[in-house]
C-alpha cells in the first residue's frame, strides 16, 4: 500500500453547482494552498453538473504535494427551505414577521434530502432540525 499523503489544509466553500470559476472567493482560497485552481473548477463543475441552480457546499482536502480531493455535500437547509417556500430570502425579523408557510410534508421531503449530512438518527429528528431552521428564517411550519 502506498504511504499516506500528509494533509496540509481543509477548505470549506459554498459554490453554485456547475459554476465554479477562478474568480473570488474560489481563486484566493485555493491559491493560498497552492492548488491548481482550474483543475479544481473543472472537476467540481463536472461533479455538480446535474445539480445546476443549487448552492453546493464542498470540502477540499489539500495534500503536501499540492494534490487535492473534494467531497460535495447536500445543498444547505436554508437554500432548500427558500426554494420550497418560494421566497428569495428569509425574514429580517423572524419572530415578528413571517414570510411564508411550509407543510409538514415539504419539511419531511427536505429532511430526507439532507439526511446524510444531518446528525439525526431518523427522519422525524431530521424534520425537527429542518423545522427549526425554517422557524429561524421567519417561515412557519404547519402540521
Curated annotation (Swiss-Prot):
Record keyword Iron present: no
Record's function text: Forms part of the ribosomal stalk which helps the ribosome interact with GTP-bound translation factors.
Top-level taxon of the source organism: Bacteria
Key words, A-Z: Methylation, Ribonucleoprotein, Ribosomal protein, RNA-binding, rRNA-binding
Protein name, per record: Large ribosomal subunit protein uL11
Protein family (similarity comment): Belongs to the universal ribosomal protein uL11 family.
HAMAP family (UniProt xref): Ribosomal_uL11
Quaternary structure and interacting proteins, as annotated: Part of the ribosomal stalk of the 50S ribosomal subunit. Interacts with L10 and the large rRNA to form the base of the stalk. L10 forms an elongated spine to which L12 dimers bind in a sequential fashion forming a multimeric L10(L12)X complex.
Record-level GO BP terms: translation
Gene3D superfamilies named among the record's database cross-references: Ribosomal protein L11, C-terminal domain, Ribosomal protein L11/L12, N-terminal domain
Annotated GO MF terms: large ribosomal subunit rRNA binding; structural constituent of ribosome
Alphabetized InterPro entries for the sequence: Ribosomal_uL11 (IPR000911), Ribosomal_uL11_bac-typ (IPR006519), Ribosomal_uL11_C (IPR020783), Ribosomal_uL11_C_sf (IPR036769), Ribosomal_uL11_N (IPR020784), Ribosomal_uL11_N_sf (IPR036796)
Mod. after translation: One or more lysine residues are methylated.
GO cellular component: cytosolic large ribosomal subunit
Amino acid at each position: 500500500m502506498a504511504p499516506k499523503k500528509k494533509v496540509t489544509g481543509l477548505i470549506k466553500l459554498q459554490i453554485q453547482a456547475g459554476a465554479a470559476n477562478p474568480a473570488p472567493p474560489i481563486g484566493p482560497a485555493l491559491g493560498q494552498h497552492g492548488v491548481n485552481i482550474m483543475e479544481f473548477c473543472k472537476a467540481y463543475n463536472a461533479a455538480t453538473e446535474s445539480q445546476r441552480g443549487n448552492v453546493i457546499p464542498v470540502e477540499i482536502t489539500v495534500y503536501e504535494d499540492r494534490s487535492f480531493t473534494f467531497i460535495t455535500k447536500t445543498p444547505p437547509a436554508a437554500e432548500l427551505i427558500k426554494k420550497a417556500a418560494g421566497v428569495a430570502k428569509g425574514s429580517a425579523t423572524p419572530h415578528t414577521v413571517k414570510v411564508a408557510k411550509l407543510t409538514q410534508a415539504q419539511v419531511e421531503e427536505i429532511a430526507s434530502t439532507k439526511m446524510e449530512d444531518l446528525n439525526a438518527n431518523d427522519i422525524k429528528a431530521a424534520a425537527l432540525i429542518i423545522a427549526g431552521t425554517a422557524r429561524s428564517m421567519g417561515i412557519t411550519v404547519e402540521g
